[in-house]
A protein has these predicted regions:
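Beta-propeller-forming repeat regions
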Residues: 1-352
């Protein structure tokens, strides 16, 4: 199941897409659910994308040439919006007034991410040389591709040497070191050493690499001012299917180090393409950013926050069943936050 949250004039809108593709939209305000709207049937497996502006939110359709498991996003530049997605043959499609295709040989489940200044990053050059299969299949990307959709051009392409691959569907973009410039956060892996976090510049240059603990995945979740001094840190789950350890990384002077761990966290289900397993926000209006993540049994959500010396679970929400959706949220007009999650039988929305 997928949830998409978006702002409303009062409260928030929630688009709910079931595993079978049935889609509905609801408005949640002041503890009341209203305005149910039935939306067009969606292709199962694809993450839904909702556009909003002055009009009501609109659920984007899926072009016929779009890969079955791909995500899509709207890219803007020079006053024009363009849709970006991966086609069935691995091309990156840029569709606006005109349609362009960039032959980057992307995995068919790859999803672009915005860097800023009109540039975007996506994984490319699919390979079968790493047979882990944690993210839905045994095909992984081996390159990081930076594009400018306005000019429909590739402006940087970083290719990993064998046996390395990128193990992920979408890079994470954030200013990790506080210099005002974005970094591109990825997970790289090989069959001998396992996975580790690798950070790149928008030009595709490797800036830093995190520690390696042996075979197993690293699930990059969010970057936010988690640090006790409000320093930006990166939240990552070490081996979410085995070790279940949340780690906070900090990038400083080219060094990427782990500052605090918390056990008992499972942000991903093995084989799933749903990687949206956390929300970072001030969830209880205490002035501190918490990370909301599932526990190992995926029947509870816990809020983790950093202290001066470690990280701790501050409070939890019981779900009454196993989590079956992504976690997502939206800022409210009153300064609060609405967060949503779903089990097989219920959709929950909490507002602060």
């Amino acid at each position: 199941m997928w949830l998409v949250a978006h702002p409303a004039s009062q409260g928030s809108y929630w688009t709910v897409v079931t595993a079978e593709g049935s889609a509905t939209r609801w408005q949640v305000y002041d503890g009341t659910v209203s305005d149910k709207t039935i939306l067009q049937q969606q292709a199962p497996g694809r993450p839904p994308v909702v556009t909003s502006g002055e009009s009501e939110p609109r659920l984007l359709d899926h072009p016929s040439i779009m890969s079955r498991n791909a995500g899509q996003m709207m890219a803007s530049g020079e006053g024009t919006s363009r849709r970006m997605f991966v086609a069935t043959n691995g091309d990156l499609v840029i569709a606006g007034d005109d349609r362009f295709r960039l032959p980057i040989d992307a995995p068919t489940d790859a999803r672009p991410a915005a860097i800023g200044n009109g540039t975007y990053v996506v994984y490319g050059d699919v390979t079968g040389r790493y047979q882990h299969g944690a993210l839905g299949d045994t095909l992984e990307p081996s390159s990081l591709v930076v594009v400018n959709p306005t000019n429909a051009e590739v402006i940087a392409r970083t290719v990993l040497d064998p046996p390395l691959v990128f193990e992920g569907l979408q890079p994470l973009v954030a200013d990790l070191d506080g210099d005002g410039e974005p970094e591109i956060v990825t997970t790289i892996a090989d069959s001998e050493n396992g996975a580790r976090i690798a950070v790149y510049s928008p030009a595709g240059e490797r800036i830093a690499t995190g520690p390696v603990y042996g075979p197993g995945w690293r699930h990059q979740l969010a970057a936010a001012p988690f640090g006790p001094d409000d320093t930006t840190e990166l939240a990552v789950v070490l081996k979410p299917h085995v070790t279940h350890t949340l780690e906070y990384y900090r990038l400083a002077d080219g060094d990427l180090s782990v500052r605090a761990p918390v056990d008992g966290i499972s942000s991903h289900t093995y084989g799933s393409r749903n990687l949206d397993g956390a929300v970072a926000a001030d969830l209880d209006a205490d002035g501190t950013v918490e990370l909301l993540v599932p526990t190992t049994d995926r029947r509870r959500l816990v809020a983790v926050s950093r202290t001066s010396s470690d990280a701790r679970i501050q409070w939890e929400w019981e779900l009454g069943g196993q989590l079956t959706s992504n976690l997502t949220g939206v800022g409210l007009d009153d300064g609060g936050v609405a967060v949503g999650a779903a089990t097989a039988n219920d959709v929950f929305v909490w507002s602060t």
